[in-house]
Amino acid sequence: MEKVKAKKHLGQHFLNDQQIAQDIVDGLTLHGSYKEVLEIGPGMGVLTQYLLKNNSYHTKVVDIDGESIEYLKKVFPQLKDDVIHGDFLKADLADWYPDKFAIIGNFPYNISTEILFKVLDYREQIPEVVGMFQKEVAERFAAKNGNKTYGITSVLLQAFYDIEYLFTVPEHVFTPPPKVKSGVIRLKRNNRTHLPCDEKEFFKVVKAGFNMRRKTLRNALKSINVQNISMDLPIFDKRAEQLSVQEFFDLTNMLSGK
């Protein structure tokens, strides 16, 4: 059967290493007791084949590429109606899943961050994600405070998920090979059903802090209307990258007068 042509505008790089594909699928731990798994951007099904061998969950795949969809239907007839031709970013995931489900994929680099922000929107339904990203992006998501790659996305994602960097993937195991290495990470939903601070204010404080990441919080937070707070407190001598997620919660409450 003729292979699917990788399309540059879709950010497609097809993984062709079977052991790495198996290792990615093995990254799923069933954290959160889900019974459904959604694979985003399956391409030619290198991950799909291993997902279908696992009887612990039921697999669906979604791809925006019509050529890939037709290929998958022929190669994996057992998927039947579980091959979805659509745009994950535009879909209402509750239409596909009334209950919990995990997400896995070799994510297109050009939309990988958007995928995880959509995951945040459905965080009560998605207890686990295993995904491949550009290495520097994967490292940023998993970074802890004090690391130069720690940033806005690190904090916002880690407010709701525990993130673990699993392994690095070299360029040559893809067709076509990307120009950078890739990294696989796993996100596991933590126990926070609600943040211990106002969510909108938290997002605002995090973004303001990192938008001027080289400056101390005393200067970086000037864009926020801070009232009745002494800016002489030691925390304002720090830069955003030095604060843990919990310290951002505390800072948000402090600035909100709570």
Swiss-Prot record:
Subcellular location: Cytoplasm
Any GO molecular function: 16S rRNA (adenine(1518)-N(6)/adenine(1519)-N(6))-dimethyltransferase activity
Keyword Methyltransferase carried by entry: yes
Entry EC no(s): 2.1.1.182
Enzymatic reactions: adenosine(1518)/adenosine(1519) in 16S rRNA + 4 S-adenosyl-L-methionine = N(6)-dimethyladenosine(1518)/N(6)-dimethyladenosine(1519) in 16S rRNA + 4 S-adenosyl-L-homocysteine + 4 H(+)
Keyword list, A-Z: Cytoplasm, Methyltransferase, RNA-binding, rRNA processing, S-adenosyl-L-methionine, Transferase
Binding-site list for S-adenosyl-L-methionine: H13, L15, G41, D63, D87, N106
Origin: domain of life: Bacteria
GO-annotated cellular components: cytosol
Keyword Methyltransferase attached: yes
Disulphide bond pairs: none
Stated role: Specifically dimethylates two adjacent adenosines (A1518 and A1519) in the loop of a conserved hairpin near the 3'-end of 16S rRNA in the 30S particle. May play a critical role in biogenesis of 30S subunits.
UniProt similarity note: Belongs to the class I-like SAM-binding methyltransferase superfamily. rRNA adenine N(6)-methyltransferase family. RsmA subfamily.
NCBIfam families per record: ksgA
Protein name: Ribosomal RNA small subunit methyltransferase A
Organism of provenance: Cytophaga hutchinsonii (strain ATCC 33406 / DSM 1761 / CIP 103989 / NBRC 15051 / NCIMB 9469 / D465)
Phylogenetic placement of the source organism: Bacteria, Pseudomonadati, Bacteroidota, Cytophagia, Cytophagales
Gene, per the UniProt record: rsmA
